[in-house]
C-alpha cells in the first residue's frame, strides 16, 4: 500500500478512531470487564499510533511540520512554566489555535505532542496516552469547528463568544476523558 493510499484510508478512519475510545469504554462498562483499564489503555495507544501513522503517511511538508512542532513545544513549555498553578495550563488553548489555523490533524498532533513532551518533565506514566488523546481531541475538535465556520464571522473576524465557549467546553471534555 502506498503512502498516499494509506493516508487516505487513515483520514477516512479518523472519526471512527476517535469514537472508538468512548465506545469501547461504554462497552467495557456494560459488559463488566474486570481489566477495563488495561483494555482502554491498549485502545488509546492503538488510536494514537494510527493517528500518528496517518499524519506521517500524509507526507506533510516542512511548512506544515514546523508550525506544528513550534506550537507543541510552546504548549509543553507553557504547561511546565505554569505547573505550580493548579488548573491553569495553556495546552488546550494552543491546541485549539493549532486546530483552527493549521487544520484538525495538526491540532491533534499539537495536543498529543505537548502532553508527551511535557511529561518528560512531569513524569511519564499510564496517564500519558490518556493526556495525549484528550489534548489531541481538543485540538482536533477545534480544527473541525473552525473548518465548519463555527468561529468565523461574515467580515472575516473571529467570533469570540463561540471560541470562548469551545475553550470552556474543551476543559470539560479534557476532564471527562482524563477522569473517566
Segments (PLM) and residue ranges:
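Broad structural signal for hydrophobic residues in well-ordered alpha-helices, predominantly aliphatic
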Residues: 77, 97-98, 145, 177
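Interfacial segments of multi-pass membrane proteins
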Residues: 99-104, 118-121
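Membrane-embedded alpha-helical hairpins and interfacial helices in multi-pass inner-membrane proteins
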Residues: 3-42, 128-130, 144-180
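Hydrophobic alpha-helical transmembrane segments of multipass integral membrane proteins
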Residues: 70, 74, 78, 98, ...
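Hydrophobic alpha-helical transmembrane segments
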Residues: 65-70, 93, 108-112, 129-133, ...
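Structural signal for the C-terminal ends of transmembrane alpha-helices
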Residues: 48-58, 101-103, 141-150
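Interfacial aromatic-anchored transmembrane helix boundaries in multi-pass membrane proteins
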Residues: 76-92, 112-146
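Hydrophobic transmembrane alpha-helices
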Residues: 2-97
